[in-house]
Amino acid sequence: MPKEMTLADIKELKKAWVSAVRRAIKAGFDVIEIHNAHGYLLHNFLSPVSNQRTDAYGGSFENRIRLTLEIVDLTRKEMPDSMPLFLRLSASDWLDCNPEYKGDSWTVSDSVKLASVLTSHGVDLFDVSSAGNHPMQKITPGPGYQTPFAKAIKEAVGEKMLVGTVGTITSGKQAQAILTGKGEGSMGEQELDLVVVGRMFQKNPALVWSWAEELGVEINVANQIRWGFGGRPGAPKK
């Protein structure tokens, strides 16, 4: 059965976290991303759905974000200044839109507040997802369905932090519309800095090439691959 972490447990967690960050840097990783979403530990501290503590880590918004800020600061302290720090967040528990759920939950407004705080803690990119911590979550899926959350956050933080979106982004044109705030599927006029794509790469490992062709963008492809799709680069056209 899950149990409430003691203050000693939290202290040990932070020590282990720092060790993990050091290992990641030593291993040569280019980016560190803190996973603060989908019902994992830090998300559970943020959300009043799961955080029922009565000490300095529970209750108020400021207390519930305390561990996240401590982890961010510990991580940034170990990282070279040139190394990007990302943070993935569940921007909404998707409970405020379920009339059958009567309690408090983590909302987009909370995420906007947290993002505004994190701009002064060295987070370079906010990777915006949602949900994952309660069976009564009422997700409304569809193309780019989480993008409005990211755009609300970007509108608040402006140029102080990069903001990306994820979820059911399935074409280059859709991604371009989301980023520019223009065209079908843009999900609002606010521009974004990044779309984060995962499952589409499982379907098509050559996704970058496919989307580039869809958008009419020239990219460099290994010669031995391009030979099979129109000839060697630089060869005279017949």
Go through each PLM region and give its residues.
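Flavin-dependent oxidoreductase catalytic cores
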Residues: 1-238
